[in-house]
């Protein structure tokens, strides 16, 4: 031991006859370099400890170690560090490691005596008939093997993530329907390589900025031996958009049979030109499952189709790693996973057009709505926030007028009140009088029986098609009680209002007795939307020509055999004790989440949720990047509420959404 080391140890009241030796390079094991902290990564040395030259005086080293302690900075009391300096032979230096670094290294050395396979061992089943992680037919030869060199380079650049037991077993990702109606070339499954493929990777991805490596995918077919047919698993390189054509078979692919008993395992390789991918990178290798030969069931008939279910499970490949730890609270700019757009219980579902509970789904050729409808860019073509609260306006009228134009006082679009309803009247009206509801023969309807048994209900009310609002109407000098208000979007022409499916500040028609006399009176009006006067009309929001927009009306049609849906609820009618259906383009929670958060969803994909009713019937709802919802069946039928919803992942929009609900078939 050199004299300097011995003297330094005396200052620490340490026996200098003990030769304390350390090599901090062991804290940073790098395979290609024996001395990384002095050669390749000298900038990392301060993270592991403090270095002094042997020619420094013992007193100087002792004082600097005290002054560098956090306790000294706060109390100015000299505290001897818990770890004394040690001799770094190969460098000719004195090195004092940080206590936590030294303890971590010592525990790691002790842990080398443990069984290294113990933390990775997990038994999925003790029944030999049940598939365990090691079972399944691994398919190789046509797929690129993981690059060990790229993995090592990515580790050196950013640090390696911690190994865990979830790396050793397959986890459920999604399930895909394969029916006898699917023809050759039909894409059943397409997924780009990334953390979204695995639930554990998806969870851990929130802690990191980047990733790299392959993912293993296991497919299991739940059909029976009576089926015949083949699927092709195709590895599509980055930058190529899969098309539904057998031309895709020109890419590397393997085939597996519908009668395959053993699960089939594929590896999606990470083909990249950089050390790692950021979380927003979706231009990665894709795995596509395509129909190679049609599925055949000899016991099926012409009136319906049958099929089987392909279950998709995943686990990270041996080279998969996360990189660049993200501090808590940091927000990435690329967007988050759309896993919270639909509440788990239907008891929390209300419409974005009206605030009552969702009671059904309505499949239509086209779905359209502007107000309170949001897309994945956090944008809306409407004028309302995704919440329901009273509408606030002012009205100025004179000469006893009961018809006026409101002036917005709370808005996000200047001149249009937040929450103003988004349908117009059917034809020209002169609002006046009371309700007028008769049968087709002109008989007045006064009872529920007369209303329910009438073949035709004629609504000749002079304010039909307007919304009924509870009102808090205030004006200086007016001490009378507030009256019910009727509102709509329309063009005022004297005492007449005309339909208008575009809205601006001049079309906020309000029919209300605000106790106006001859002089101008300005009232402050707070309106709560409660009902509708369109007795005998079609559902609110079902007629495109009556749906109001500022300029553009967002609209969706069928995509890849999937049909757009409205979420149905109801609003109370005026006079008759009945309700009318309301069609909503989104659940209000979906609108709110899309307005507040930026989600990551490609334009050609769905965020898929599985809806299950109380009897076990289920179907998938896919939400596209425009915010519209789709289902893969033409008729949902009657569901037993309450329903539950669970996020299933991202699916290509051109693939039919799965369900166990059989569509109604008619044979001519």
Curated annotation (Swiss-Prot):
GO terms for cellular component: host cell cytoplasm; T=3 icosahedral viral capsid. The keyword Disulfide bond applies. The record marks 124-125 as: Cleavage. Pfam families: Calici_coat. Mostly expressed from a sgRNA. Expression from the g-RNA is low and occurs at a downstream start codon generating a smaller, truncated LC-VP1 (tLC-VP1) protein. Homodimer. Homomultimer. Interacts with the minor capsid protein VP2. May bind to VP3 and Vpg proteins. Binds to alpha-2,6-linked sialic acid at surface of target cells. Interacts with host F11R/JAM-1/JAM-A; this interaction allows viral binding and entry into the host cell. Capsid protein self assembles to form an icosahedral capsid with a T=3 symmetry, about 38 nm in diameter, and consisting of 180 capsid proteins. A smaller form of capsid with a diameter of 23 nm might be capsid proteins assembled as icosahedron with T=1 symmetry. The capsid encapsulates the genomic RNA and is decorated with VP2 proteins. Attaches virion to target cells by binding to feline junctional adhesion molecule A (F11R) and/or to alpha-2,6-linked sialic acid. Once attached, the virion is endocytosed. Belongs to the caliciviridae capsid protein family. This is Capsid protein VP1. The lineage of its organism: Viruses, Riboviria, Orthornavirae, Pisuviricota, Pisoniviricetes.
């Amino acid at each position: 031991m050199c004299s300097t080391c011995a003297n330094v140890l005396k200052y620490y009241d340490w026996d200098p006859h003990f030769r304390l030796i350390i090599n901090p390079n062991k804290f940073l094991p790098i395979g290609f370099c024996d001395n990384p902290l002095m050669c390749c990564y000298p900038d990392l040395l301060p993270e592991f400890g403090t270095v002094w030259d042997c020619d420094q005086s013992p007193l100087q080293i002792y004082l600097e170690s005290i002054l560098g302690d956090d306790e000294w900075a706060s109390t100015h009391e000299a505290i001897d560090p818990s770890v004394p300096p040690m001799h770094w032979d190969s460098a000719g230096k004195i090195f004092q490691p940080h206590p936590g670094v030294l303890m971590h290294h010592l525990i790691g050395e002790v842990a080398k005596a443990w069984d290294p396979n113990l933390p990775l061992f997990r038994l999925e089943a003790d029944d030999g008939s049940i598939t365990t992680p090691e079972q399944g037919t691994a398919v190789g030869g046509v797929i690129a093997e993981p690059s060990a060199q790229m993995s090592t380079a990515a580790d050196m650049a950013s640090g390696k993530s911690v190994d865990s037991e979830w790396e050793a077993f397959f986890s459920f990702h999604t399930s895909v329907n394969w029916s006898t109606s699917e023809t050759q070339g039909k894409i059943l499954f397409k997924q780009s390589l990334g953390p979204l493929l695995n639930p554990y990777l998806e969870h851990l991805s929130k802690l990191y900025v980047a990733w790299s490596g392959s993912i293993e995918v296991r497919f299991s077919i739940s059909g029976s031996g009576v089926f015949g047919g083949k699927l092709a698993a195709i590895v599509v390189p980055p930058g190529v958009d899969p098309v539904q054509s057998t031309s895709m078979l020109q890419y590397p692919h393997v085939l597996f049979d519908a009668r395959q008993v053993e699960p089939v395992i594929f590896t999606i390789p990470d083909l990249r030109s950089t050390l790692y991918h950021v979380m927003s990178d979706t231009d990665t290798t894709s795995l596509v499952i395509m129909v190679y030969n049609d599925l055949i069931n000899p016991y099926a008939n012409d009136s319906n189709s049958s099929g089987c279910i392909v279950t998709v499970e995943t686990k990270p490949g041996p080279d998969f790693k996360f990189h660049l730890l993200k501090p808590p609270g940091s927000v990435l700019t690329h967007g988050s996973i759309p896993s919270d757009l639909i509440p788990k219980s239907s008891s929390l579902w209300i419409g974005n057009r009206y605030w009552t509970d969702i009671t059904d789904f309505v499949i239509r050729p086209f779905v359209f709505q502007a107000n309170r409808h949001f897309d994945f860019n956090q944008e809306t073509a409407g004028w309302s926030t995704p919440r329901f609260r009273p509408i606030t306006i002012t009205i100025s009228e004179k000469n006893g007028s009961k018809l006026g134009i409101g002036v917005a006082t709370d808005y996000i679009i200047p001149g249009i009140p937040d929450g103003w309803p988004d349908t117009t009247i059917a034809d020209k009206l002169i609002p006046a009088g009371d309700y007028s509801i008769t049968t087709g023969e002109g008989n007045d309807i006064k009872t529920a029986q007369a209303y329910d048994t009438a073949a035709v209900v004629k609504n000749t009310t002079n304010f039909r098609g307007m919304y009924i609002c509870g009102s808090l109407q205030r004006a200086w000098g007016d001490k009378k009680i507030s009256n019910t208000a009727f509102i709509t979007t329309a063009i005022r022409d004297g005492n007449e209002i005309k339909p208008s499916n575009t809205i601006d500040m001049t079309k906020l028609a309000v029919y209300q007795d605000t106790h106006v006399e001859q002089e101008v009176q300005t009232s402050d009006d707070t309106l709560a939307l409660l009902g509708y006067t369109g007795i005998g009309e079609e559902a609110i929001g079902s007629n495109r020509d009556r749906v109001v927009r500022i300029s553009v009306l967002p609209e969706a049609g069928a995509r890849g055999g999937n049909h757009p849906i409205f979420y149905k609820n109801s609003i109370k009618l005026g006079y008759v004790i009945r309700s009318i259906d309301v069609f909503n383009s989104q659940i209000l929670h979906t609108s709110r989440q899309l307005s507040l958060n930026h989600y990551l969803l490609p334009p050609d994909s769905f965020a898929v949720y599985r809806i299950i009713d109380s009897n076990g019937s289920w179907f998938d709802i896919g939400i596209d990047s425009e915010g519209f919802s789709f289902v893969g069946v033409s008729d949902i039928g009657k569901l037993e509420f309450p329903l539950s919803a669970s996020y299933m992942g991202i699916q290509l929009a051109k693939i039919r959404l799965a369900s166990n609900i059989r569509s109604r078939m008619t044979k001519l």
